[in-house]
């Protein structure tokens, strides 16, 4: 895409005092090139700089000058190059569009108190590091999180850890749904609960623990079991308490695995209501999270069908894939696998709510604890023949269930 010089200048002038983000600090390689954005794969880049003025540019973008003064500083220090102002402005614009620059002159948003800025300051700098989108303020993602309304179904091992991470991070409103009571066998992994909570509804114990963690978050909940897609639809569309602007939840997080069809139901209801959602869990040492947004890439069913084809489990026609990794009546899990699963779910929520990191939904990723360095990653295109989101008519079984 060609960007006009006037547009480039306009982008640059939105910044009062452009500064290379501290986390993206540039350095010069032995070849004289400029490496910027840190050495983290997915963030950093290398810029050729045969004449040395790009290095001067990144040095000048230290948050002490306005854009015009940055251009003047670069041209002043390289008089022999006959640099045009447009060249320098264009390079500055490239750096801004790549996400390496923040506006040191942008005041913190008035909506965030000094106490909140202190509380969430470290998280803001991590978001700033992982963010590759130009923003008016580096606090913008924190505001998005504070305005967010999230529905969490299941507050056990995965859901409890996800709730803990989101509430600590400053999510605005979390509504928790959970029917069970705390049992002794839960305590090896459900770390929101203690021995004094045995026999108590998990919902009450979780809300008490989360309120103690962060009074900034609006915490609500209901003791309820999801028995069908209608229950999920009811939960999603009847936001309680209803937000002043009348909008339902921004996001569904599914951390329940009963009944077994619950993910299929969530997929269907989220497609129908246009709700982004994520689900996480573990199967033995495999821990993963899937994140989905209607209209953006594969849905849960697309991904599941594509993965079944890819894995080629050598199943006979009609044989259910669960025979290859059976579900056990007990739940092999500890605080590590449940905690990782919940943290991945919270991470997916931040991605869907704030766009950080800029990972497109319609994928599943995670860890295989048996083989460090062997990441779990699934991504597929949206499938035309998908029975949930596809455009071709679905094949229907005699009992009316779409397949
Ligand atoms: Zn689909």
Residue ranges and their predicted role:
Residues 1-403:
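Adenine nucleotide-associated cytosolic modules
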């Amino acid at each position: 895409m060609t960007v006009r010089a006037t547009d480039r200048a306009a982008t640059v002038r939105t910044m009062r005092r452009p500064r290379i983000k501290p986390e993206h600090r540039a350095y010069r390689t032995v070849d004289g090139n400029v490496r910027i954005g840190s050495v983290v794969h997915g963030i950093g880049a290398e810029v050729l700089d045969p004449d040395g003025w790009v290095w001067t540019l990144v040095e000048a973008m230290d948050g002490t000058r306005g854009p015009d003064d940055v251009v003047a500083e670069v041209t002043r220090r390289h008089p022999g190059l006959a640099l045009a102002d447009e060249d320098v402005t264009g390079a500055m614009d490239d750096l801004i569009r790549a996400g390496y620059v923040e506006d040191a002159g942008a005041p913190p948003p008035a909506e965030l108190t000094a106490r909140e800025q202190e509380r969430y300051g470290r998280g803001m700098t991590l978001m700033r590091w992982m963010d590759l989108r130009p923003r008016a303020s580096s606090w913008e993602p924190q505001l998005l999180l504070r305005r967010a309304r999230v529905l969490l179904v299941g507050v056990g091992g995965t859901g409890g850890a996800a709730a803990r991470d989101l509430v600590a991070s400053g999510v605005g409103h979390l509504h928790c749904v959970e029917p069970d009571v705390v049992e002794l066998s839960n305590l090896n992994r459900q770390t929101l609960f203690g021995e004094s909570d045995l026999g108590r509804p998990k919902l009450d114990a979780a809300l008490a623990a989360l309120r103690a963690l962060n009074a900034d978050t609006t915490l609500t909940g209901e003791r309820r079991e999801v028995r069908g897609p209608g229950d999920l639809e009811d939960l999603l569309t009847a936001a309680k308490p209803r937000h002043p602007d009348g909008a339902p939840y921004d996001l569904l997080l599914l951390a329940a695995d009963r009944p077994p069809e619950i993910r299929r139901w969530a997929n269907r209801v989220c497609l129908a209501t246009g709700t982004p959602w994520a689900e996480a869990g573990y199967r033995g040492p495999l821990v993963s999270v899937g994140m989905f947004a209607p209209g953006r890439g594969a849905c849960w069913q697309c991904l599941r069908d594509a993965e079944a084809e890819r894995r080629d489990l050598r199943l006979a026609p009609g044989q259910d894939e669960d025979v290859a990794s059976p579900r056990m009546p007990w739940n092999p899990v500890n605080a590590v696998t449940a905690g990782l699963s919940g943290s991945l779910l919270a991470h997916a929520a931040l991605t869907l709510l704030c766009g950080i990191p800029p990972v497109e939904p319609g994928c599943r990723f995670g860890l295989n604890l048996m083989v460090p360095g062997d990441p779990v990653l699934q991504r597929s295109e949206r499938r035309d023949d998908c029975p949930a989101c596809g455009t071709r008519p679905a094949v229907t079984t005699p009992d009316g269930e779409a397949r």
